[in-house]
Amino acid sequence: MKNDSVLSSTVYPSWHPRLPYVVFSSNKTGQVFHMLDTEKIEVLDWASDLVFYDVKRNVIRNILQTQSDFETFPCWSPDGKKVYYTCATVKELESLPDSLKIGFVKMNYRNLHYNVMSIDFDEKTQTFGTPVVEVDCASQNKSASVPRVSPDGRYLLFTLGDFGQFHIWHRSADLYIKDLKSGKVFPLTQANSKDTESFHCWSSNGRWIAFTSRRDDGSFTRLYLSYFDKEGKEHKAFIMPQQDPMQNVLLLKSYNVPEMTRDAVTYSAEDFKKVIYGKEEHAVKYEQNNNQ
């Protein structure tokens, strides 16, 4: 989804739980390859904003649009009254010409630290409130990505690493929880490993977490499951069972961005292809942010 008034194409969509609204981030993304590092590749944003899409009206607008704040990975709370996301602040970009900004981000990628944020949403007016820091990761020289709230609204699950936000490439990345009732933040020790944990999701009843991990060989992500009990405690993770167990050993591809469903998917890959590529494109209209 594109519009000249939006930074770039929209990614990381999250549907409102009841209304025909979608929040995205709009990201200018690039990658660099390491020559002398334990990591293989670094994926990073040169810029990113949050955008809101009204499906029925076919209207898109910016939620937050700043030069120095990189907002990404938005998700709605289960009641639809709040959006969670992550944000890194790079004040130096405010004084740099556009020609130097990408180079600055490349040279300082290890100093990009994303906090977990939230912002209130008023359904009646379609307006957003003031951003609030949920987890101050930057003060600990850490960086968060992919916040997701449990279906009961009690727990905020996110990935925490040393820097950046594309943690599927970071061995330091682990799963963390914030108890939104008590405010306590803690790692999922029974689910984490010495290697990468990154993208994740909740089951519809909030009792299971599915996530990607590179604990097996350090190169390919596999899907793991961890039971999350009513007391807010995770249990020992195990790899997703396959009809052929060797599938998890021999597959030279990575699983990515898991989503759990209550029912089997009834559409084929060809059905999705027709919807994505077979229909005529329609321009999306841009509307000024109501907050401005």
Where is each model-derived feature located?
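Sequence signature of WD/YWTD-type beta-propeller architectures
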Residues: 1-292
